Amino acid sequence: MDRCDFLPVSAEEMHERGWWWYDALVVGGDAYVDHPSFGTAVISRVLEAEGLRVAVLAQPDWHDAEAFRAMGRPRLGVFIGAGNLDSMVAHYTAAKRRRSEDFYSPGKRTGCRPDRAAIVYCNRAREAFGPDVPIILGSLEASLRRFAHYDYWDDSVRRAILFDAPADLLVYGMGEAATIEIAHRLKKKQSVHTMTDIPGTGYITRDPSVCKFDHITLPSFEDVRDDKRLYAEATRTEYAEHDPVRGRAMIQPCEGRYLVINPPAMPLDTRELDRVADLPYTREWHPMYEPLGGVPAIEEVRFSVIHNRGCFGGCNFCALAFHQGRMITSRSHASVIREVEAMTHHPLWKGYVSDVGGPSANFRHPSCRQQKERGMCPNRLCLAPTPCPNIDADHSDYLTLLRKLRQIPGVKKVFVRSGIRYDYMLCDDNDAFFRELVRYHISGQLKVAPEHCIDTVLDYMGKPHIGTYERFMDEYRQLNNKYDKEQYVVPYLMSSHPGSTLSDAVALAEYLNRRGRQPEQVQDFYPTPGTISTCMYHTGIDPRTMKPVYVAKTPHEKDMQRALLQWRRPDKRRLVIQALHEAGREDLIGFGKDCLVRPMTDRRKPAKAVEPQPPQRKYGKVYGGGKKPAAAHSAQNAKPGKSAKPGRAGKPGASGKSGGKPGSKPGRSGAKGGRR
C-alpha cells in the first residue's frame, strides 16, 4: 500500500502532496489504521470529504509540545481522540495490573500513549498552539467521562473531563454530524466559543444562561463527590435524558463554573451511514509501521463489516448505549455489498467475511415503532428482564442481507462473530434466521453472553434470566444435529458484578459443573467510566431503584469469585476451597460427582515400585520391560448430546469461554461490540 493512499502523517508527506498548509490536525491515541473500525480514520476521512486538508498525528510524543507542531499550525483546529478504548482500560486489567501488550500499537508495544490520553493530548496541544487554535475533544474516553464520574484507578470521583482537558468543545457519541457542523462553522470564521447550540456537544461556561436548550440541573461535582446517593441520582438522570428525541440538556456546576452537555445528536440515518462507510479507507495500517510488525488490531476486523449502530440490549455493565445510544440505525444493503465487493480485491483476501455485525449483530432496525416520535422508554428496557410487549423482533432484513453477501463472486463464507442477542432472536416467530445462522454463518463457535445463572444477579446486570439461555441452547443443539454440524457456543461469564455474592458465585460454579461446562477464561467485572454497574460498584446503590446492592470490593473476594468459575484449574484450587469454606459449602469439597474440588489434605499414594526388567530382543530391536503407555483420549469437551469421536478430543471451548474484553481487539467499549 502506497503512502499517498493515506492521509499525511508528517511534513514530508504533506510537501509530497504540494501542501504548504492544512486545515485540521487529527490527533489519535492509537496507531494510524485507515479502517472504518478506527475512530481516527473515520473522523479524518469525514473531514477530508468536507473538502478539508487533513493531517493525522498518531500516538505523538506527549512529553514535548514540539511533536504537535511538527506539521505546522492548522488553519481551523485540532481534533483530539484518545483511541478506540479508554486509555486506562487499554493500559490496565480489571485487577489494576499493567497490560503486557497493546493491540492498538505497532508490534503490540506498550507505552505508546499516556495514561488519561485525552487530558494529556489536550494540554500538549494547547501548549503547542496557544489559546487561539480551537481544540475539539472526542472519542470514547471523552464521551464516557463527560460528566463527573467515578474513576476506578484513582478510586475517587473525578471532575468532568473538560475541567482537566483544556478543549473548547467536547463531542460525545459517534460524532460525525457534530464534527462536520463544527468544521463548517470554523470555515465561516465563527468563534468556537459561540458554538453552544450543537447537539451532541458539551462545553464549560461561567454563565449557564447561554444554554440554548431546555435543560435540567444535575447535582454539582462537589455534591456527587461527597454524597453517594446524589451520585446515584445524577447517574439515573444522565441515562434518562440520553435520548435524541425527548432528552434535555444537562448542566452540572463545578467549582464556580458550569458544565453544559447539550442533548444527543440524532443518529445518522441510512444515507448518512452509507456515506461514512463509502469513504476511501485503505483498510490497512500506515506503511510506517511495517518495520515494527504492523498493528495487530487490524487482523480481527480487516475483512469485517459494521452494518448497524446503537444497542437497545440494556446491559448495565456496557458503555455502548451511553456512547452510541439505544436507537438502531443501519446501512443499506447496497452499501454493505459494495464494501464486501471491494474486500475481494484486497491482496490478502482469502474468501472469508469474518463478521457482519456491530454492537449487537442481529439488531438491524429500531426495537419498536414508537421511538421516532416518543424516543426510548426512560424507565423500561427493551429486553430485560423480559422482552417488552411492543418489541418488533424481525430478522428478515438481516437475513436477506446475509443471503446477498453469500452470492458475491469470490466470497466463500460469510460469518457472524459479533455477539448475538439470543433473547431477541427467540422473540422472532420466524426461525429462518436462526436456522441459516447455524447452517451458514458460524465459524465453529458462536459468541453469546448469559453472564450468570442467578436471576437476581442478572437483573442487576440488565440481562435476561437463565431460562432464556437454556431455551436457546436447546434449540441450538437441535439445529446443529439437524444440519450435522459440530459447532459450539462460547458463553461469556462475569464474576464479581455488583449484586453477586460469594454464594451466587458458588451457585454459578455448580450450574456449570452439572452441565459439564468448563470455562477457560472469565471476565471479572471492570468498573469502567459511565456505566450503571460502575455506579453500583462505587455507591452500593442501584440507581434505577435507589435501593442498596451488595458489592464485592476486596481483591480477595473478587479473586475467590473468579476462581469458582475456573474451579478445575490446579492453580485456583486453594482459592476455591477457601471460598467454599467461607460460603458454608464444604459439601462441595470431596470426591463425589457434584463436588468441585478435592480436599487439600488429599495426597495420591506413590506408585508401587516395579523391578526393572531386562531388555528383550525381538526382530533385531530392543524393547524395555513394562507396558507401553496407552494413548489417552479425552471426551470432556465433546459436543453436548454426542460422544467424542474415537481418537479425537472435543474442541476446546466447546462449552467454555474463550476470549475476554476490553483491551483485546476492537470491542467491549470500542467501535464494535463484545459482550451481548
State where each predicted segment sits.
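N-terminal [4Fe-4S]-dependent radical SAM core
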Residues: 1-21, 31, 229-304
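Intrinsically disordered, Lys/Arg-rich low-complexity segments
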Residues: 604-676
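Terminal amphipathic helices with adjacent charged low-complexity linkers/tails
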Residues: 63, 193-242, 256, 265-268, ...
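Flexible glycine/acidic-rich beta-alpha junction loops that bind and position SAM and/or redox cofactors
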Residues: 86-95, 144-146, 176-181, 205-209, ...
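Flexible, glycine-rich loop/tail regions that form catalytic "lids" or insertion modules at the edges
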Residues: 24-25, 69-70, 198-201, 290-291, ...
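N-terminal pre-triad scaffold of radical SAM enzymes
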Residues: 27-32, 292-319, 352
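Glycine-rich beta-alpha loop elements in corrinoid/cobalamin-binding modules
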Residues: 12-13, 39, 58-254, 261-262, ...
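Conserved SAM/AdoMet-binding glycine-rich loop
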Residues: 26, 42, 61-62, 342-490, ...
